[in-house]
């Protein structure tokens, strides 16, 4: 009765030795297949055949432009990424059998996504705005308006707002105030004084010229002439005893406007009102 349990234990050990239990888990960098724990292929290699009771896992290196970046049991390697220049892409880091190619954007462009499958141009900050944050390969330009005391007169994706020039530090005076798009204009104090005095001098000279022209015009204006003195008519007497003298009525000769005028005797000598004046 005592020997039976002992025999059962012996038979159980024998059967276990002949038919071992399949493992339920494998170690790191191994995989379970056909009740066997086979080694994974290292990065840069692909699986050709699984291991057996008598052979190890068979792996081969990836081909040109291919890669595998982890311990694996893949039968095919992955193709390297293509950086399409038509999309603004260029190779930042060439791929190997263990790493993929890394693409980035051309200068002045940035990726539209984390995968960087295409690019767009950086934004430029217009005049009056400066660059707060310069664009990177994966982010766009960030602009900000120039505050008081600063300006930007260009459209740029790199220029920040510049401070106004300090005229005082150069012993100059401000001739024109700055804006968010223009710098302060400085100049010497003598020039500023001249800019004030010269227009005043020109104004005075212009006023004098106007007065002289007015006086000249007044001097040329004709004055009223004094009236000619009224001349009394002169009587011309002819002797009666001259031969061939005419016995007709005597004729008087007067002056009309300094010209002799014949007046018959016996008629009154009258001068028109207009002639008297």
Swiss-Prot record:
Expression tissues: B-cells and in primary carcinomas.
Keywords: Cell membrane, Disease variant, Disulfide bond, Glycoprotein, Immunity, Membrane, Receptor, Repeat, Secreted, Signal, Transmembrane, Transmembrane helix
Transmembrane segments: 194-215
Biased composition range(s): Basic and acidic residues: 264-277
Tree of life domain: Eukaryota
Topological domains, Extracellular: 21-193
Claim: Iron-sulfur is one of the keywords in the record: no
Disulphide-bonded residues: 26-37, 38-51, 41-59, 62-77, 83-103, 105-119, 111-116, 125-143
Consequence the record notes for mutating residue 26 to Q: In bladder carcinoma cell line Hu549; requires 2 nucleotide substitutions
Alphabetical list of SMART domains matching this protein: TNFR (SM00208)
RNA-binding found in the keyword field: no
Region entry Disordered, spans: 223-277
InterPro entries found in the cross-reference section: TNFR/NGFR_Cys_rich_reg, TNFR_5, TNFRSF5, TNFRSF5_N
Connected disease: Immunodeficiency with hyper-IgM 3: A rare immunodeficiency syndrome characterized by normal or elevated serum IgM levels with absence of IgG, IgA, and IgE. It results in a profound susceptibility to bacterial infections.
Record-given protein name: Tumor necrosis factor receptor superfamily member 5
Organism: Homo sapiens (Human)
């Amino acid at each position: 009765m005592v020997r039976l349990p002992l025999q059962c234990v012996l038979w159980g050990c024998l059967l276990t030795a002949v038919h071992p239990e399949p493992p339920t888990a494998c170690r790191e960098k191994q995989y379970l297949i056909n009740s066997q724990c086979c080694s994974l292929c290292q990065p840069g290699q692909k699986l050709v055949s699984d291991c057996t009771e008598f052979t190890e896992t068979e792996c081969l290196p990836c081909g040109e432009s291919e890669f595998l970046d982890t311990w694996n049991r893949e039968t095919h390697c992955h193709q390297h990424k293509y950086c399409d220049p038509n999309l603004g892409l260029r190779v930042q880091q060439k791929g190997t059998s263990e790493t993929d190619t890394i693409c980035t954007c051309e200068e002045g462009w940035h990726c539209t996504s984390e995968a960087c499958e295409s690019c767009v141009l950086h934004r430029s900050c217009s005049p009056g705005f400066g660059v707060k944050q310069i664009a990177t390969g994966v982010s766009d330009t960030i602009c900000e308006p120039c505050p008081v005391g600063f300006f930007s007169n260009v459209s740029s994706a790199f220029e920040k707002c510049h401070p106004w020039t300090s005229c005082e530090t150069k012993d100059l005076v401000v001739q024109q105030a700055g804006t968010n798009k223009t710098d302060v204009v400085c100049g010497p104090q003598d020039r500023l004084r001249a800019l004030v005095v010269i227009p005043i001098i020109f104004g005075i000279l212009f006023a004098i010229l106007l007065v002289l022209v007015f006086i000249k015009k007044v001097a040329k204006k004709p004055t009223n002439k004094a009236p000619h003195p009224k001349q009394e008519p002169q009587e011309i007497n002819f002797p009666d005893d001259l031969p061939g003298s005419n016995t007709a009525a005597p004729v008087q000769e007067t002056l009309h406007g300094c010209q002799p005028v014949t007046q018959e005797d016996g008629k009154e000598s009258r001068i028109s009102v207009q002639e008297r004046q």
